[in-house]
Amino acid sequence: MRTPPVNVQTTNEVRNTNIVFFQGDCFPIISTTQFKAGRLKDFAHNWKKLTSDAFILDTVQHCHIEFKQGSSCDQHNVRVQKFNSTEQNIIDAEILRLCEKGVLEETTHCKGEFISPIFTRRKKDGTYRLILNLKEFNENVEYHHFKMESIQSVINMVTPNCFMASIDIKDAYYSVPIAPEHRKYLRFKWKGKLLQYTCFPNGLACCPRLFTKLLKPVYASLRQTGDEIVPYIDDSYLQGDTEQECWQSVKKTALLLQDLGFIIHPDKSVFLPKRVLTFLGFVINSIDMTVQLTPAKANHLREACTKLLNAQHPTIRDVAQVIGLMVSSAPAVELCMLFYRTLENEKIDALKENHGDFDARMELSASAKSDLQWWVDNVQQSEKKISPPNPDIVMTTDASKQGWGAVRDHHTTGGRWSPAEAEKHINELELKAVFFALCSLCDNVRNKHIRILSDNTTTVCYINNMGGSKSRACNIIAKKIWQFALERNNFLSSAHLPGTQNMLADRESRVFNDRTEWMLHQDIFQKLSLLWGPFEIDLFASRLNKQVCTYVSWKPDPGATAVDAFSILWDRKPFYAFPPFSLIHRCLQKIIADKAEGVIIVPMWPTQTYYPRLMSMLIQMPRLLPRKENLLRLPHSQKSHPLWKKMQLMACLVSGIVSKQKEFQKKQEESCCSHGENLPGTSMASISKSGNNFVVKGTLIHMTYL
């Protein structure tokens, strides 16, 4: 029969120990009352069985501080500190507690001593930690770069439905003894007494590296036997595919740590395997594979953001502290990186303006306040997926100095840059290509994971990191990309694709069809708008040559309302159309079918088959457009149309509603008069000698210049 797990219990059978039970198995935990500072030295014989590393054995028995070459550790001034009565009582109690443990000892002055100030920090459990302010002394300590595990190391190890546990070492730093000859550097004064640390203090710069290095052989020996474990200073995360695997890891780790002299904190450890574990302020869930902030941590961050949001002129330090909280929450807040960089950039700018003075005041922009509001509204519900799902859509993009291109499945698109855009850095253009690709090919995609493949490493980095700090311009575009995706509840990821494998998107960014890009001069368009507008949609346009904000493109386009004008109804909005000449006949059919009304720009070619139909659909006299070199130009190069001298364009207000056509024709019959020549009344489309008059179904059509 399966024995239910129980919590840590105190037993009378084993003196000064607790017993941890799990499914009929157990192991002892040494009582925390047994703790004495520097106790690792009493277990040096066990450390020697584990490692022969001289540096580690020295640290275990009498750790020596590593000084910079040539450092003298001279102290010029000893600052006098003042504390209020409440602070004094807290410090008195903490000093007494530390003296009882042997962490502090009373001493006398000696040559070469270094006396530092002290301060306290409130801990989560409401007690206080005494900290030696070694900022000045640390300038003499040798710095070594080292790798320390983080919460991300833990998250990377989590697998679906795995079991997890954690072990917390009690007073971990205080377990490591400081060599007697180096204790004189760790002194402070209190109420006429001179006190010094006998072990690692909180605040010594080399301690995190030394403690991490000290535990390396410990965890290496456990990993060699198959235990999955991640240490972080005094905390250890343990994992197993089954409850028993995880339990055995807990048992082996706890017993080994105790054999080496460490005391395990039973209240802060989680010995019994579980699938939802709180570790380092994060809630790790292997069932749904997510990470969340603990409620306390989320509330603290929300309160900090609210306070900053309400501050009129916060100090730069206030802003920096909130940014620190935001960044530390990143493993559990999916969109963290998207909503902190504006604040970070403004902090950097403010520091430059104030010559590095963190106590100077700054003003937050509307954008920064908007980001803060996002945190206030969302941080308590935020989570982050440990393993994003496989992509549903894969899209390749590319950019050149000429234009952009994109490919999704068998659909391709691309376009030229405007002259101003072409001047931008290629990294900006590559990111803009991604934005245009999403707008063009994924506008209607919802609830999907979209993978972007790019041969530009900056693009990959800025998408995966939701922005970056090196380029403000790239960061702005990256934020637009993500906001576009989030509005559609899509998730983005990016991967690098070698340029040799990105040929289709590359081609789209360099090869263009300019025959569809001719644009009517904006002054002429404005005159037409005043005459017959305003127009609500441009039916044949692109991002660069659109005359109206709402437009339809002939291929996927980042700003288009729709693709292919013939795929939508034209009857709802007064339209402006400047179609390719080969599509004029089809446009007239569409206008009739949809009973639409609008302006169409066409060449005055009476010999074309569509011409009689066009004239019969008029509801206002056509306007001839001036034959000028700049009438038609390509927007990206301002090149003029090669036929501008020979081609006469006209603007026609047409309708697909027969009653409106007949009403216009009737008015012309009533108002027409002779211009000195006779036209055959039966002619369907005859042109007068003046070149500006036509007869359509017996009605004289007189053209005038715009």
What annotation goes with each model-predicted range?
Residues 142, 156, 271-384, 499:
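C-terminal reverse transcriptase regions that engage the nucleic-acid substrate
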Residues 192-210, 214, 307, 409-432, ...:
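A short, polar/acidic, helix/strand-boundary loop motif
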Residues 98, 162, 173, 194-227, ...:
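Conserved pre-motif C helix in the palm subdomain of viral-like polymerases
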Residues 42-76, 121-129, 170-195, 209-224, ...:
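Reverse-transcriptase-like RNA-dependent polymerase core
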Residues 138-144, 175-177, 224-260, 282-293, ...:
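Catalytic palm subdomain of template-directed nucleic-acid polymerases
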Residues 11-146, 193, 230-235, 333-364:
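Reverse-transcribing Pol proteins
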Residues 438-503, 507:
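RNase H catalytic domain
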Residues 55, 208-252, 256-257, 266, ...:
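Active-site palm subdomain of RNA-directed nucleic acid polymerases
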